[in-house]
């Protein structure tokens, strides 16, 4: 399987007939109400059948920053409580996702991360993807806020016939 990023909003995935994918969105991974046990169960089921993982957007909730009007200290996981909230969230996410990094192909942006980027001049999705790739050697791509995932499916039994599927993603 080969993934390529064309610009900020187009990701191409060359795969084979029969390849499987787990498509996720709005994980809000750092929120206390994120059911990580259920998420882990779904991820491990996907990995057991050889599926790759794509995350559409809002990977993080990340709404508890200093300048967020929606912030509530009750909505911070204990491991993220500290003066370096953003760093704690990203570092803990990288640690949790490291064992799945080779199965993760793509992480898109959402309104939560983009709001933080505007207020704090920090791109937490990019930071997460870059740090995960650095620590694990994976090749996870980050996408735009909305865009296209283009699947090109080769069919070995038919030798030259390929199918192309274009999937729009947005929040």
Whereabouts are the PLM-identified features?
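Short glycine- and acidic-rich boundary segments immediately preceding or forming the N-terminal edge
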Residues: 1-11
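Polar low-complexity intrinsically disordered regions
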Residues: 1-2, 99-100, 160-161
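Core catalytic region of metal-dependent phosphoesterases/phosphodiesterases
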Residues: 9-20, 24, 29-141
């Amino acid at each position: 399987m080969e993934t390529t990023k064309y610009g900020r909003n187009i990701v191409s995935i060359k795969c084979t007939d029969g390849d499987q994918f787990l498509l996720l969105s709005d994980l809000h991974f750092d929120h206390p109400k994120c059911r990580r046990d259920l998420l882990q169960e779904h991820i491990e089921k996907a990995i057991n059948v050889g599926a790759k993982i794509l995350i559409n957007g809002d990977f993080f909730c990340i709404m508890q920053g200093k300048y967020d009007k929606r912030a509530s200290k009750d909505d911070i996981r204990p491991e993220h409580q500290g003066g370096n909230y953003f760093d704690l969230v990203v570092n803990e996410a990288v640690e949790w996702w490291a064992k799945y990094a080779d199965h993760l192909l793509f992480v898109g942006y959402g309104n939560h991360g983009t709001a933080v980027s505007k207020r704090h001049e920090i791109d937490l999705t990019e930071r997460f993807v870059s740090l995960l790739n650095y620590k694990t050697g994976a090749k996870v791509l980050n996408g735009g806020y909305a865009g296209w995932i283009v699947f090109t499916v080769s069919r070995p039994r038919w030798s030259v016939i390929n199918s192309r599927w274009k999937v729009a993603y947005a929040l």
